[in-house]
Amino acid sequence: MTKKAIVWIREDFRVENNEALAYASQTHELVSALYIYNPKNFDKKREAQKWWLSRSLENFSLDLKKFNISLEIQSGDELDILKNIKKEDDVSIYWSKIYEPDIINKGKKIRDLFIQNDIKYKYFKGNILVEFQEMTKDDGTPYKVFTPFWRKTEQFYISKSPTKNLKIKSKEKMINFFKKSISPKELLPKKNWYKKFEKYWNPSEDNAKKYLQELIKSKIENYGETRDIPGVSGTSKLSPFLKFGQIHVETIWKKCQDIKVKQVGYRKYINELGWREFSHSLINYFPQMLKGNLRKDFDNFPWVKNEKFLE
């Protein structure tokens, strides 16, 4: 076992229910968290994501400091940054999986790099209830229909969900593996349009928990109706927090199970979590969905051009 560990953070900006971070803190004397900002992943269409990322890094860094764990931020291609880690550094690398085809393919190259350089590594289940590889039909083929997929997935998760010790162990001192680290503020969009945005959102783990409590307390009962009314704050507001991993889907699912009287809205919301699981399965078994239709007969779907229908 190496003395030092690096936890490679990608979409898991949380200390609660973070298996990679918990494992590293429990088994290594010195721990550092690493985020790699790849500019290629953030074009002009993703300016809002850059703002959320910047604020997430700031808040997550503060959360980690409570455990004497530093957050280091590097800019560049993931492979180029991780090449700097050598065997003589005597460090182990840990991370959580992301279930997107392109990221999975890049992950294979990174694992090959670590094997080639004799770097110890370990990865853990990501922000999902059940990994898509475990959910197939009895004949081994993937599901294309939601209802049977989610019925089987939910039953499987309930029966197999293990209880793990995911507490973060505080370190005696902080370390920095890299000589220099960029500031989260350097990732902010150049134009400060986000000033108004900040009146409505604060990307942090604590706020994710707050929105979950609001959902359970006052929204989920009527979720099936109010989520579709623009003038009513009827949605959970948890989507961006899930995207950046400031809350784990398991945390949401388990909190929902604590509801004593489960109304129709409860099932509606739980099914939304199911659609998230289903989407992970579909894009991996049918990656053509990322650029086209799952069913080819919809490629030339006839559109009716009639302005009266829009009145």
Stretch-by-stretch model annotation:
Residues 7, 36, 40, 90, ...:
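Alpha-helical context
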Residues 310-311:
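Pre-Walker A segment
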Residues 1-160, 265:
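Trp/Phe/Arg-rich N-terminal binding region typifying the photolyase-homology
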Residues 294, 302-307:
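Small-residue-rich helix-loop
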Residues 142-298:
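Glycine/tryptophan-enriched, flexible segments
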